[in-house]
């Protein structure tokens, strides 16, 4: 199953396939202003021209196939993208990449590309739900923290938990109300 084609999902797919990034809230707000001003396709074409306008169709196709996680059938996927881009004016390659991504997202039952399409859709859905404030590589965990019983203390107050992370005065304190 493909993702719901909202402008957010389309932009996240475009950013992931071309830039290897998921868009945070600050950048998404700027993108939405651009979309409001000139429309989605014009925005994608503008971003593409600015960032990749000097690349060949083969370079773009290789970048997209790599970022989509296509390993099986990658040569055929690159050839397909090169063919589609080659049939269009370079001024609409951003929109064309978006159309290729939409077609790819529906290939979940395909014997060759199905697993990659399914994994890609999962990444796009996660990116669309992303509410962070910074832009990070698509699929990146922003931070993790492992708690160990010997170094971390938990104190219970009325309807509130207070966690102290660390054993010095410079520890991190987290209050959780419930």
Indicate where each model-derived feature is located.
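Substrate/cofactor-recognition hotspot
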Residues: 1-178
């Amino acid at each position: 199953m493909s993702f719901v084609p909202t402008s957010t999902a389309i932009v996240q797919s475009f950013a992931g396939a071309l830039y290897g990034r998921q868009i945070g809230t600050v950048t998404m707000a700027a993108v939405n202003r651009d979309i409001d001003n000139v429309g989605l396709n014009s925005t994608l074409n503008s971003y593409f021209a600015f960032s990749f306008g000097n690349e060949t169709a083969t370079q773009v196709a290789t970048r997209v196939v790599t970022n989509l996680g296509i390993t099986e059938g990658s040569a055929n996927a690159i050839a397909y993208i090169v063919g589609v881009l080659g049939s269009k004016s370079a001024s609409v390659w951003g929109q064309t990449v978006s159309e290729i991504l939409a077609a790819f997202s529906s290939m979940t039952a395909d014997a060759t590309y199905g697993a990659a399409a399914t994994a890609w859709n999962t990444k796009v859905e996660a990116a669309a739900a992303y509410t962070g404030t910074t832009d990070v590589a698509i699929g990146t965990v922003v931070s993790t923290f492992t708690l160990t019983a010997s170094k971390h203390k938990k104190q219970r107050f009325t309807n509130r938990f207070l966690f102290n992370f660390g054993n010095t005065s410079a520890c991190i304190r987290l209050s959780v109300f419930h």
